[in-house]
């Protein structure tokens, strides 16, 4: 495997440089005086941003884009082996590396590499940790899987020896990483188009933890079923727990304001450390914040900086994001696409002022919908009214013969108020006819369901959130 050393800059060419992760890695390397070029199928705001920094971006992709002098080529999983540039790089014998491998090699250049892993909560928790590090003037480099408001995007290039990133389990990509601190938020069944079952997922997380160096740290949710399994045979690696019971970091005396934003008393190793007030909603974010606090305290950050940063942190794009109002009802958008995430979002919404709670849910991938259908039905049933859109295919073809109507039939058999409306214009028409003043409507899913709320808020009389 090709090593990346910041003190030995190379010429690196990115095939698919316009992706949110690839563009961030390109920017980090440019800051470290690497020569960076790249290509993509079309221009985008991200490619235009890279060009404004001085990176040559070729559109479209072509074998002629592989110039003499390129020393390493990086590609994404979306690039097929019959891609012209991929073929030309192979023909020339230029070393190649996947995006995940490059990310892992980059983090080896930092003394402290913090990786946040878990079935859900990664983007929010990574952003919370980033907010705390910035409040404490630690000048971190941050790469996150969503839009973090205080850095104006998904990337912050710092000059310190701290690197912060999400670590995704899909296709075992986090097995390419080299963390010194690993955060494990939760471990549940997901990505069942790749993993065989929950046991294979658990083994994948265990392998990730074992990538820590002997003096590394794992911060783990004590509420994960059989969490002790992940801590077996860790040698001298340090362990910090958060959650309930006798965890090292716990939240007690929890209360919520009018908008479901929690406050709690923080206990560290059983000692009362005072009140923490969050500006994000829901019980799940209490436990996300506990993991962030644990990391920050390990790095020697004061409670004052931690509390200030967490109070200021208002969330990331598409995480219980208040979008606006129309006809007197409120529209919120949320990325939840796993049953546990849906349950957490609905639990937060129940604490939010409303008459009726409506969920407009777009299932994400056929394999996930089929494998977790019973769980989806149970989670969604906690709302008053549910509208199901067509399944968002993402990377899949419908080889399992399933549709949102199958989920509707299951939910109807359980006496849930549910409607299957395939297309967005019909969904929007139904909403305008049936959702009333004082209701709360959440567009939910990891696909393009956000467009429903955007369309409604573009109508005359709508009020957008600032």
What are these regions (language model features)?
Residues 5, 28, 34, 51, ...:
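Phosphate-binding loop of NTP-binding sites
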Residues 33-49:
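NAD(P)-binding Rossmann-fold cofactor-contacting core
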Residues 35-38, 141, 387, 419:
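Conserved beta-strand positions in the Rossmann-like core of class I SAM-dependent methyltransferases
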Residues 377-437:
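C-terminal helical cap/extension that packs against the catalytic core
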